[in-house]
């Protein structure tokens, strides 16, 4: 036979569990709803994976028309997320490389070489094998990124 206290603890436990589940669902939905249609939310940022192709400069311009930049890759989790969602196509990212193998992101930050970069051309893209460079006039899809405010 269950005492009043046991019933009370069970009811409180069920209510707390229900509230936690509701909060998790709401936070997940809110984070995604802060991103525009066709954009994907991850780590307080929204990402757009283009369906069309363009050279690096036109890709950068297309992102700017959406109040975004070609994506910057801040950490390995972000790199893994981008590689997972880009499917099999190569996508331009917001990194330009100089002849001396130094790189600069579109926000002005220096490329810290936190991940490998194949190739010796001027503009960076993401492939199935990671990051690489190509001639900037090559047509590729692109990835835009903007922060959630």
Swiss-Prot record:
Membrane topology, Cytoplasmic segments: 1-7
Assembly with partners or alone: Homodimer. Interacts with NKp80/KLRF1.
Location(s) in or outside the cell: Cell membrane; Golgi apparatus membrane
Function: Membrane-bound protein expressed on myeloid cells which acts as a ligand to stimulate the activating receptor NKp80/KLRF1, expressed on the surface of natural killer (NK) cells. In turn, stimulates NK-cell cytotoxicity and cytokine production leading to the cytolysis of malignant CLEC2B-expressing myeloid cells.
Membrane-spanning ranges: 8-25
Cystine pairs: 35-46, 63-144, 123-136
One GO MF term: identical protein binding
GO cellular component: Golgi membrane; plasma membrane
Record-linked CDD domains: CLECT_NK_receptors_like (cd03593)
Glycosylation sites: 57, 62, 100
Pfam families reported in the protein's UniProt record: Lectin_C
Domain of life: Eukaryota
UniProt keyword list: Cell membrane, Disulfide bond, Glycoprotein, Golgi apparatus, Lectin, Membrane, Signal-anchor, Transmembrane, Transmembrane helix, Ubl conjugation
UniProt-listed PROSITE patterns: C_TYPE_LECTIN_2
Gene: CLEC2B
Domain C-type lectin: 42-145
Gene3D superfamilies documented for this protein: Mannose-Binding Protein A, subunit A
Main location, first listed in the record: membrane
Membrane topology: Single-pass type II membrane protein
GO process terms (BP): NK T cell activation
Induction (free text): By TLR activation. By IL12 and IL18.
Post-translational modification note: (Microbial infection) Ubiquitinated by human herpesvirus 8 protein K5, leading to endolysosomal degradation.
Protein's recorded name: C-type lectin domain family 2 member B
Coiled-coil segments on the chain, per record: none
């Amino acid at each position: 036979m269950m005492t009043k206290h046991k019933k009370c603890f069970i009811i409180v436990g069920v209510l707390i569990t229900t509230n936690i589940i509701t909060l998790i669902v709401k936070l997940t939905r809110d984070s995604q709803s802060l991103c525009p249609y066709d954009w994907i939310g991850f780590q307080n940022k929204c990402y757009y994976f283009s369906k069309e192709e363009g050279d690096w400069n036109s890709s950068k311009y297309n992102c700017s028309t959406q109040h975004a930049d070609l994506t910057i890759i801040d950490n390995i989790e972000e790199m893994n997320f981008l590689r997972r969602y880009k499917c099999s196509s190569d996508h331009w990212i917001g990194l330009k490389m100089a002849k001396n193998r130094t790189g600069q992101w579109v926000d002005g930050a220096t490329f810290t070489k936190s991940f490998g970069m194949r190739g010796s051309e001027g503009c960076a893209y993401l492939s199935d094998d990671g990051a690489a460079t190509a001639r900037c006039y090559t047509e590729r899809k692109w990835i835009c990124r903007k922060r959630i405010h």
